[in-house]
């Protein structure tokens, strides 16, 4: 058995859940089993980007004992555009 954590957060609420899973479980399968979509109704675990310890991973990545799966939210603005706006605001 593997013991992993899965985390998801919004600005006002974060959830960290510990799970016991069978060897060979993939990152997407674990996310779907987590039940986080029952806590956050706008969360779609079938398509949400996933990562392990801050690094994006493919859906079929097998988990290792102690992994922390992170469920990422979609970007609200392109990072390059956000930087341009910050620089523009500083110049004004």
Swiss-Prot record:
Mark the transmembrane ranges: none
Pfam entry (one): Ub-RnfH
Q: Which SUPFAM superfamilies match?
A: MoaD/ThiS
- What family is this protein classified in? Belongs to the UPF0125 (RnfH) family.
> Which HAMAP family does this one have?
UPF0125_RnfH (MF_00460)
Q: What is this protein called?
A: UPF0125 protein NMB0796
Species name: Neisseria meningitidis serogroup B (strain ATCC BAA-335 / MC58)
């Amino acid at each position: 058995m593997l013991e992993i954590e899965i985390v998801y957060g919004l600005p006002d609420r974060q959830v960290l859940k510990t799970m016991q899973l069978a060897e060979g479980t993939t990152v997407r399968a674990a996310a779907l089993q987590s039940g986080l979509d029952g806590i956050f109704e706008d969360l779609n675990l079938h398509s949400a980007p996933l990562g392990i310890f801050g690094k994006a991973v493919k859906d079929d990545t097998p988990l290792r004992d102690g992994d922390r799966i992170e469920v990422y939210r979609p970007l609200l603005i392109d990072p390059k555009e956000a930087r341009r706006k910050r620089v523009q605001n500083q110049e004004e």
